[in-house]
Regions:
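Alpha-helical, largely C-terminal catalytic domains
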Residues: 1-197
């Protein structure tokens, strides 16, 4: 263990207090950064298995892909014209003197360069996680989410997704009801509720 490991763990815990930047324009309850990272990591794991990538590396990159946001915040497309963030500096300071410092630096550089399958998978997962959240928000009537889904996200599928699996997932997300996973359950409670024994 390194001298700053516990401080690092407290800092990443603070990501649950960091809302996603688009809270400003979306009316539904948006995720915090921790929630975004968790589901992005699960998506990345699925893609990594399908694409036969290095799962260990994919999961590590995914866990830290937005780590700078604990210090640099999250910004949306609207803010990019007005705000300069120093993400590399934030990443360096976050991992400084931790046991993960060297490996995290290498993985974050790999992610930024997008040259490896693993880095591309994580970027696909990052984008697909946005599509899942927009679909959920649209389902509860957020008109801004509906607009973003129709006007902007098809371009992401065509121009920003790297993997075949990522593109197939995007297509499936568009066709899937966010509530379908629990509405078709066949467990004992659901059967009893429907009158089955």
């Amino acid at each position: 263990m390194a001298k700053r490991d516990i401080d690092f763990l407290f800092e990443i815990g603070s990501l649950r207090n960091m809302p996603r930047a688009w809270q400003q324009i979306l009316s539904g309850k948006v995720q915090n950064i921790s929630e975004h990272i968790f589901r992005t990591t699960m998506i990345a794991w699925i893609i990594a298995v399908a694409e036969k990538a290095d799962i260990n590396k994919v999961i590590k990159i995914s866990l830290i892909h937005d780590i700078a946001e604990s210090r640099a915040g999250d910004i949306a497309f609207l803010h990019r014209e007005y705000v300069t963030r120093h993400e590399k500096l934030a990443e360096k300071h976050i991992f400084k003197d931790t046991i993960l410092e060297k490996e995290a630096s290498v993985l974050l550089e790999e992610y930024d360069e997008r040259q490896t399958l693993e880095a591309r998978i994580v970027k696909d997962a990052d984008n697909l996680e946005v599509d899942l959240e927009l679909k959920e928000l649209a389902k509860i009537g957020d008109s801004s989410a509906v607009g973003m889904q129709k006007e902007h996200r098809p371009e992401v599928r065509e121009k920003k997704l790297y993997t075949k699996t990522g593109k197939r997932m995007w297509d499936s997300i568009q066709k899937t009801d966010p509530n379908a996973w629990h509405q078709s359950l066949t467990n004992r409670w659901v059967k009893n509720r429907k009158g089955a024994k």
